[in-house]
Amino acid sequence: MVLEVGMGGALDSTNVIDMPEVAVITNIGLEHTEFLGNTLEEIAMTKGGIIKKGCDVVCYNSAPEVVSIIRQLSAVWDAKFHLVDFDSVTPVSHDLSGETFEWSGLTCNVPLLGDYQLHNAATALTAISALRDRGWAIPDDAVVTGLSKTRWPARFEVLGREPLFLLDGGHNPQCAEVVAENLTKYLGDEKLVFLTGVLSDKDYKAMIASVLPHAEQFLCVTPDSPRALDALDLRDYLRGLGCSADAYEDIPSAVHAALLTGKPVLAFGSLYMAGDVRSSYYKEKKTAQRKYCMNSRRMLTPEQRIEFSAELSKNLTKLPEVQNATHIFSYMAMQDEVDLSVFHDWAEQNGKVLSYPISMQNGHMEAYTLGEEPVWNYGKYGIREPNPDFSELRAPEDFDVILVPCVGFDEDGGRIGHGAGYYDRYIDRAPDACRVCIAFEAQKLEKVVEEDTDMPMDYVVTEAKVYTF
């Protein structure tokens, strides 16, 4: 178990562990001074309260006075002290996908941006080494995989690339300086549109000063906090500096305006706006991608749809999971979707049990197997659905394979549906089923805008190819 301290250490609610294996002290700055103390030494003493007798202590190599305090506390508690050696990780390359480095003969990648992420990685790896010394079996492949799957939302996070859209929740001058350094490192002299909101009790003037050389214009919003600086006041301050600045009534409007510029965007200034920025961005981009894919599908002629649907059905029958399946969750096509009639004929001839969805009023759907004499209804979306009075309800765990229609997909297994989330919610109830996305090749995108609630696919089957993940 890994416990992250909320604030400080000695008096934090997480500090109830009698004998931790490793206590990790990360970088310490002058934050929460009203609770933790006004100097680095005072804060270090509070942070060091998580050190217990006989544990290992991993200390981020920060200010000398901090390191000295943590070293002394480790000695008091007879705890083995490890000072993180930042040179233990050797940078190899960096781009907007993350940082690649070498450590102890391994080539590792973290999908996080900024030089300080290498320092954070070195800290984590030092903790791993300490655990190994204490007898923990942590294989190299687990280290490499764990680093590659690390996520840190709203820390110079790339939400999208067309145009580039960055999100950073930094809310103090120190964070702003790091943001400015990262902009120089990754984008050079390129100017950005800043979507900015700040809290009135933060030193926002110093924050603005750090990023000003990188700004082409500012779109000002009011974060969701009683301490927020009103967007109009922020706009007026920026205009007083000679900046191009406009105020927006809400965050969705500002995100929409930022994307319309077609220029790189950085949403920045407060964690209180990060969640709204993320959701608004995904909604905007998914709407655009959904429209593009539906238009692409609509451009197919009726003859092409029939031909491609038949070819796709043949590809589908070749999947081992489909050939070995007993229960298959399928669907009836709507509008211009892939028609699986050819596949349904094959499935029935080969003894497969087919079930079809019914959309329920509560935002969920259920699957029903038709009776010997099929009786259909037309659902609220105009799709043919089994009549539940003449069909058998199937539990999600019954299914070996679930066929999932889509609006768009990418080569990494990303999928865009119609936006209601019916399939994502159902798939979550059937964790052992093979998930197969069904689409025409014309519906392929370079990269789907994904959200945390989007369920990954095992295959995407088109008339031209089977994509495996």
Residue ranges and their predicted role:
Residues 2, 26, 43, 74, ...:
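Residue-level signal for inorganic ion chemistry
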Residues 151-155, 175-179, 251-252, 305-322:
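A short, well-structured juxtamembrane/interface segment
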Residues 194, 202-204, 285-397:
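N-terminal active-site beta-alpha-beta segment that forms phosphate/nucleotide-binding
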Residues 56-61, 194-196, 216-224, 352-358, ...:
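Short internal beta-strands
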Residues 1-4, 20, 25-104, 121, ...:
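Acidic, Mg2+-coordinating active-site environments of NTP-dependent enzymes
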Residues 368-469:
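Conserved phosphate- and dinucleotide-binding cores of soluble alpha/beta proteins
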Residues 1-3, 12-24, 28-29, 42, ...:
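Nucleotide phosphate-binding/pyrophosphate-handling subdomain across enzymes
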Residues 63-82, 97, 164-165, 208-264:
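C-terminal helical cap/extension that packs against the catalytic core
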